[in-house]
From Swiss-Prot:
UniProt KW keywords: Cytoplasm, Glycosyltransferase, Purine salvage, Transferase
HAMAP family per UniProt: XPRTase
Organism: Oceanobacillus iheyensis (strain DSM 14371 / CIP 107618 / JCM 11309 / KCTC 3954 / HTE831)
Molecular function, one GO term: xanthine phosphoribosyltransferase activity
Catalytic activity: XMP + diphosphate = xanthine + 5-phospho-alpha-D-ribose 1-diphosphate
The protein, known as: Xanthine phosphoribosyltransferase
Binding-site residues for xanthine, renumbered to this chain: L20, N27, K156
Amino acid sequence: MELLKNKIIEEGRVLSDTVLKVDSFLNHQVDPKLMKQVGEEFAKKFRNTGITKILTIESSGIAPATMTGLELDVPVIFARKRKSLTLTDHLFTAEVYSYTKKTSNEISVSKDFLHEDDIVLVMDDFLANGQAALGLLEIAKQAKATVVGVGIVIEKGFQTGGKQLRDKGIRVESLAIVESLSDGTVRFKEEARI
């Protein structure tokens, strides 16, 4: 998605060979026009799959998932990272390790919202080592829901998450795949092959 790639180049900041900061438009401040186009793009990719729910994780997955849900006219469920006083039992849970924050979180979704007859699109802002996506897939599995794929805004193609999911036969659609962040420069997958 060219608009997204341009935004990454213009506003993204490479903090290291593995860390890309995009907080000016995706995971702190959100660019609604960009998110609308992200939603439209994912809707095009998954429109004919019969999706009944979109499953994401708080908090940075919520904006792209919501815009996709709006385009597909389906509800969005977000897994919580912290226990809520109103969300105590009757939960699907999974353990997710964050390499960025170096912490492990138990994520949870109420059993009231995810069911065996649901057809689910899993979404997140980033795919790096795949831990968040695997946690969301585990929750969908516990619900006995059918997963049609994983939608990712930015995939770090140089990390193992995308390969790990694809090797399991999971359809992964990423709007931008970053092949390298070396030398402080963002290189996308298509550019690396030229």
